[in-house]
């Protein structure tokens, strides 16, 4: 039974990793396209395109407006579509906490400590480089790791990569996501509307009630999650946080246990009419039995797993590429003709490249030397170096926090984005070079 559980977890991880890896490759292409357009003769058209307003209006009510402002395409992507991304992240975090690499203290300790170091050191480096300057407010930018990009780079080595390295990278990236979510919720709240917060709390009670009373219809959680998103948008708390909060209320237990499901399938097979095996047209009785099997199959998959599986494709192949296409198009030249770089650029670059590596590596070394954890199977101090460098690929959440930090300062925003893109590229290249040397030449034995 334990072996079956482990196999199921590995299958779940590998399926999720497949989406992340392919999505990471797509992101790379989209970033290059956005950079090309932003620095081409069509740069002004590219920049102005994202300022078109988005409306969903019924009478006088516009669903995509808040505080008297209408959403543009850019804010629709960053505030609405990215809420779906954070909903998916919330589902992944909940799964990891319940049955994954964060489900036990000893399992979780190494990636949690590594992630804490990977968040703390970049923030400190950024702070000391920008203290007392307008760029200081972006100190959370270099604390994130982009799981899709980093797994995309790791996938270039194919079966040479031990599964333990992929699991470790994914686990500490998930903890990074938790840190990023907390930062967004706590430090990027512009104002608070008590009435909308109270209404949001009411919706949260409905969602928690659905979980408590075992409501397994996933549309229940989607509907009330969308309402919560709108209330968060109006409340002043960043709307994407609604996605995470709603995700944590989605049930992780299926309606049917495996044993009951197997019995139901056997019962249906026993009554399935098979008199004419050559017929290409099913009888009404056969259709009814097959529908019963389909219904039972739906009920053995928990709402959490069902939603996570359904959203992976949309998030990795539509939402994140759109986000990258809208946000990564940075003009490389300033008005004076030079590169658009400044203190924010160098601080983000140092945080992602040096801070991430030093924080993850040192904190991992510390917790192992203190005897609280050990290196995972297939992990060495040399290939760990490459994984620590991959932690400096901060793309998606780093760009997202940059928008929140410098939304009112286009110059600082551009400088920070330059730092994110440079840091991501350099971290990816250095990680590739280190892992090319550190990983075994033959496929890893699991």
Curated annotation (Swiss-Prot):
Keywords: Antiport, Cell inner membrane, Cell membrane, Ion transport, Membrane, Sodium, Sodium transport, Transmembrane, Transmembrane helix, Transport. It is a multi-pass membrane protein. One of its GO terms (biological process) is regulation of pH. It comes from Phocaeicola vulgatus (strain ATCC 8482 / DSM 1447 / JCM 5826 / CCUG 4940 / NBRC 14291 / NCTC 11154). GO terms for cellular component: plasma membrane. Na(+)/H(+) antiporter that extrudes sodium in exchange for external protons. Belongs to the NhaA Na(+)/H(+) (TC 2.A.33) antiporter family. This is Na(+)/H(+) antiporter NhaA. It is found in: Cell inner membrane. The chain crosses the membrane at residues 23-43, 73-93, 109-129, 138-158, 167-187, 193-213, 219-239, 314-334, 348-368, 381-401, 419-439. The keyword Cell membrane applies. Its main location: membrane. It holds the Pfam family Na_H_antiport_1. It catalyses: Na(+)(in) + 2 H(+)(out) = Na(+)(out) + 2 H(+)(in). It comes from the Bacteria. GO terms for molecular function: sodium:proton antiporter activity. Disulfide bonds: none annotated.
């Amino acid at each position: 039974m334990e072996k079956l559980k482990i196999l199921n977890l590995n299958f779940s991880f590998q399926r999720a990793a497949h989406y992340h890896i392919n999505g990471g490759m797509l992101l790379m292409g989209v970033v290059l396209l956005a950079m090309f357009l932003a620095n081409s003769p069509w740069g002004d058209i590219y920049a102005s395109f994202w300022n078109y307003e988005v409306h969903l209006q019924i009478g006088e009510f516009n669903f995509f407006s808040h505080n008297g402002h209408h959403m543009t395409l850019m804010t629709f992507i960053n505030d609405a579509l990215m809420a779906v991304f954070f909903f998916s992240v919330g589902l992944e975090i909940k799964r990891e906490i319940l049955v994954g690499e964060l489900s036990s203290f000893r399992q979780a300790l190494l990636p949690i400590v590594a992630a804490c170091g990977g968040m703390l050191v970049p923030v400190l480096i950024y702070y000391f480089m920008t203290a007392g300057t307008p760029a200081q407010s972006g100190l959370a930018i270099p604390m994130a790791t982009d799981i899709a990009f980093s797994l995309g780079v790791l996938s270039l080595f194919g079966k040479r990569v031990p599964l333990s390295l992929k699991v470790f990278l994914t686990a500490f990236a998930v903890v990074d996501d938790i840190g990023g979510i907390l930062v967004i919720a706590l430090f990027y709240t512009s104002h608070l509307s008590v009435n909308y917060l109270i209404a949001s709390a009411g919706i949260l009670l409905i969602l928690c009630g659905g979980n408590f009373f075992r409501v397994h219809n996933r549309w229940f959680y989607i509907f009330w999650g969308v309402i919560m998103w709108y209330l968060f948008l109006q409340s002043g708390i960043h709307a994407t946080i609604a996605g995470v909060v709603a995700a944590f209320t989605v049930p992780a237990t299926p309606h049917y246990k495996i044993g009951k499901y197997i019995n139901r399938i056997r019962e249906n097979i026993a009554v399935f009419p098979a008199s004419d095996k050559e017929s290409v047209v099913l009888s009404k009785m056969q259709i009814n039995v097959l529908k019963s099997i389909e219904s039972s199959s739906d009920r053995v998959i928990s709402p959490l797993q069902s939603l996570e599986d359904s959203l992976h494709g949309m998030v990795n192949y539509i939402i994140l590429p759109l986000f990258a296409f809208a946000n990564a198009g940075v003009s490389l030249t300033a008005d004076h003709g030079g590169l658009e770089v400044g203190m924010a650029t160098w601080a983000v670059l140092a945080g992602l490249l040096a801070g991430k590596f030093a924080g993850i590596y040192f904190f991992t070394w510390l917790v192992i030397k203190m005897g609280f954890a050990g290196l995972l199977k297939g992990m060495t101090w040399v290939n760990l170096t490459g994984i620590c460098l991959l932690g400096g690929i901060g793309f998606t959440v780093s760009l997202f926090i940059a928008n929140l930090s410098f939304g009112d300062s286009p110059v600082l925003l551009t400088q920070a984005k330059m730092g994110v893109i440079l840091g991501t590229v350099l971290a990816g290249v250095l990680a590739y070079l280190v892992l090319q040397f550190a990983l075994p030449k033959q496929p890893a034995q699991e």
